[in-house]
């Protein structure tokens, strides 16, 4: 690695530590020429799979687009940004874990719906209504009924009165 101070090529690693929950390595280095010290961070370059849409077109995975879609579903809902970011991280991990170079976009949609259902039922129904193209109120009602029957998750459930 080149020294950022004198551009010499020879440096030595003095210290290495895992940071960012083990997904990054922080290295403390020293230049063998000028003896200046500097820090570098090392992360694995992970390639996300391309998404194959229903019309057959392919597009690269876009985390910003994922975040925007989830934020739209979660608008004015009591879900923290930390919980949203954790859900996005889990979705990205699941996409990488498939090991595939290409995935159907509907698979990403299913991952998103699973995460939203854990975060907030209202956000889940909002997303599902667009994702599954609900045509009328009966489809909304059927999805809400299915959620009520599933139950078991603490937090904001559909159909339950709000506490004041």
Swiss-Prot record:
As to how many cofactors bind and how, the note says: Binds 1 zinc ion.
Tell me, what is an example of a GO biological process annotation in this record? negative regulation of DNA-templated transcription
Positions annotated as zinc finger (unnamed): 3-34
Q: Which UniProt keywords apply?
A: ATP-binding, DNA-binding, Metal-binding, Nucleotide-binding, Repressor, Transcription, Transcription regulation, Zinc, Zinc-finger
Q: Extract the GO molecular function terms from the UniProt entry.
A: ATP binding; DNA binding; zinc ion binding
Residue ranges of every copy of the ATP-cone domain listed in the record: 49-139
Which NCBIfam families has this protein been placed in?
transcriptional regulator NrdR
Describe the task this protein carries out: Negatively regulates transcription of bacterial ribonucleotide reductase nrd genes and operons by binding to NrdR-boxes.
Q: What is this protein called?
A: Transcriptional repressor NrdR
Q: Which organism is it from?
A: Alcanivorax borkumensis (strain ATCC 700651 / DSM 11573 / NCIMB 13689 / SK2)
Gene for this chain: nrdR
